[in-house]
Amino acid sequence: MTSRLPISQPEHSPSWHAELHLGFARAGERTVLRENRHRGPLRVQKALYPEGEAVCQTIVLHPPSGIAGGDHLAISAEVGEGSHAQLTTPGAGKWYRSGGAEASQRVAFTVGEGATLEWLPQETIVFDGARARMETQVDLAADSRYIGWDILCLGRVAAGERFEKGRFDLFLQVNRDQRPIWIERGGFDGSDPMLISPAGWAGATVCGTLLCAFPEWPMQASALLEACRKIVPADGAQHGLSALPGVLIARYLGNSSEAARLWFAELWTILRPACCGRPAVIPRIWNT
């Protein structure tokens, strides 16, 4: 089912107020996109099946290509019992300089019994002067599976720009059976000493986090950590992997979004068979 929600954006406002809701369900051996509702520029074009009917891949599109001050985006997905959804994006997300208004993006995922979700977006670039808030919440059933990442770039390093003005706030929570297994909250201004402190970003411009959670994780943690620790970012950046009771956490801190993305993709090729029960198949959109 595909429908367009009524537009409620005020005519005098140039900002985007966009929503996208996706619903996935199991139909025999096939995962189907049963709901695809959108308002504003957020949307997916169609369901893709690059590795057979069991996994439904969707590419989340934001046509204006960036988020400006006053924009508010909401992305939600429900992955129904026994289904397998993979969400990715065609390019980097961009948070533009703001004239004063805050922009926000809220992502909310619900993963049902025996279901699997992969959230594999490309990097997010925060322009100097942006005022942005990103919130992500993932609610897992007792036996569902999740692997996802976020890569945050402060400033446009290739253009010689650093994040020196503005504000960025981040919230991330993953729940298993209504109990949190990971909570992360942070916020900083462009002039925050934490960005250059050895105890903080240490002058780096790119930070990434990968999370992987699945029911068998406690029994496989040792072997998977050993395999993952043999892989390091190509640029030699600071990185680490941690095994918590219900989730694996991988961290990147450096200056290359490409190195972070490639490292996470290599970790994903190791983790996906254990987490999702399937070999890694690189999304074709990553190569375009």
UniProtKB/Swiss-Prot annotation:
Disulphide-bonded residues: none
InterPro entries in the cross-refs: UreD
GO cellular component, one term: cytoplasm
Key words of the record: Chaperone, Cytoplasm, Nickel insertion
Presence of keyword Cytoplasm: yes
UniProt keyword Transcription regulation, yes or no: no
GO molecular function per UniProt: nickel cation binding
Taxonomy, superkingdom: Bacteria
Subcellular location: Cytoplasm
Pfam families xref list: UreD
Primary location group: cytoplasm
Main function: Required for maturation of urease via the functional incorporation of the urease nickel metallocenter.
Family: Belongs to the UreD family.
Subunit structure: UreD, UreF and UreG form a complex that acts as a GTP-hydrolysis-dependent molecular chaperone, activating the urease apoprotein by helping to assemble the nickel containing metallocenter of UreC. The UreE protein probably delivers the nickel.
The name this protein goes by in its record: Urease accessory protein UreD
Organism from which the protein derives: Dechloromonas aromatica (strain RCB)
Gene: ureD
